[in-house]
């Protein structure tokens, strides 16, 4: 049975529930006696309460499994005792979806913390869980040695043999070989698949590999050639734009990133990257794009960028800053104000 990764609509419901509980969290925070330093800020206490709330959702067996899984994934944003305990319990759950959620949470952690949660699932009874555990830990391969490699290597070998013999399987094999520095094996797969499947996702995967070995010229050639057949592919324009940006060709990068955003304006990442580069030359365009992607996605990072750009341009940012104060930590907003409004 296939188990999908956490549905982000469920994650959104968790976040909305947390926001609705915000004021009650503040009230509860006021009643908590701080440990040690009495100058612990209310923001820190509220963050702890949010973490506790997510941990409670994660472990509440009365809730639907998708909501528990979404809460578990969001615990990856924290690394306090509540997160550690809840994610560890999820990793041992009888429900594969909870174990997958534990992996997604730990994926946001670093080094040993990630390893300790995920490594026991390298030989999970559920194939989807086992596969996701391998995919999560393989990125640590260049930094591992000794017993860690001894534990991970056979899991990777087993995973490689179980991958399907189709395009998806081959692209994943090539990605794994790249992480293991088996560049010749990776390139043989990419080249063969590109010659037989000149479609955007294959070209992009091959180009990303080439960028990784600092061959941007070849990567750009692959992307431009594929764009001839697929001129409406936003992903191709975006990948090409990033390649130009890597080598300092900022105007070429700007044109390609603008193309990507115009072709797929609902993609927040495309808009954010384009606007961040565009504001060097066209601050009004950047403001327009930041405002649009924030309205579409309501990501605090997009709102922060909008406020910052308004301040850079010397425009009225009061309404933007007021909204930012409702979704971002107070110290973040205060520091932004001080950069442009020191008095």
Language-model segment annotations:
Residues 32-46, 66-78, 89-92, 97-111, ...:
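Structural detector for internal amphipathic alpha-helices that build alpha-solenoid repeat scaffolds
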Residues 58-66, 91-97, 122-128, 161-165, ...:
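Short coil turns that connect the paired helices of HEAT/ARM alpha-solenoid repeats
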Residues 78, 109, 124-125, 162, ...:
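Structural marker of alpha-solenoid helical repeat scaffolds
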């Amino acid at each position: 049975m296939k188990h999908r990764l956490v549905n982000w609509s469920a994650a959104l419901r968790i976040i909305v529930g947390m926001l609705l509980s915000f004021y009650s969290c503040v009230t509860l925070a006021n009643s908590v006696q701080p440990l040690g330093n009495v100058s612990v800020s209310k923001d820190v206490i509220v963050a702890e309460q949010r973490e506790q709330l997510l941990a409670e959702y994660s472990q509440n067996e009365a809730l639907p499994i998708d909501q528990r899984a979404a809460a578990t994934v969001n615990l990856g944003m924290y690394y306090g005792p509540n997160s550690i305990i809840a994610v560890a319990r999820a990793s041992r759950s009888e429900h594969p979806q909870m174990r997958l959620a534990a992996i997604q949470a730990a994926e946001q952690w670093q080094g040993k913390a990630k390893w300790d949660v995920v490594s026991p699932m390298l030989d999970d009874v559920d194939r989807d869980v086992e596969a996701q555990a391998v995919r999560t830990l393989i990125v640590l391969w260049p930094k591992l040695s000794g017993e860690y490699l001894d534990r991970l290597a056979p899991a990777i070998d087993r995973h490689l043999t179980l991958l399907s013999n189709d395009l998806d399987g081959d692209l994943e094999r090539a990605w794994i070989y790249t992480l293991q520095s088996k560049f010749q094996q990776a390139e043989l797969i990419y080249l063969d698949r590109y010659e037989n499947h000149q479609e955007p996702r294959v070209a992009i995967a091959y180009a990303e590999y080439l960028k990784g070995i600092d061959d941007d010229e070849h990567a750009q050639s692959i992307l431009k050639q594929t764009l001839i057949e697929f001129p409406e592919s936003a992903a191709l324009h975006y990948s090409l734009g990033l390649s130009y940006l890597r080598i300092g060709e900022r105007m070429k990068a700007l044109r390609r990133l603008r193309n990507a955003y115009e072709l797929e304006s609902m993609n927040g990442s495309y808009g954010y990257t384009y606007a961040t580069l565009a504001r060097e030359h066209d601050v009004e365009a950047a403001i327009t794009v930041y405002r649009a992607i924030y309205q579409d996605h309501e990501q605090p990072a997009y709102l922060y960028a909008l406020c910052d750009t308004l301040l850079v341009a010397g425009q009225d940012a009061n309404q933007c800053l007021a909204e930012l104060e409702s979704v971002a930590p107070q110290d973040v907003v205060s520091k932004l104000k001080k950069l442009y409004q020191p008095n």
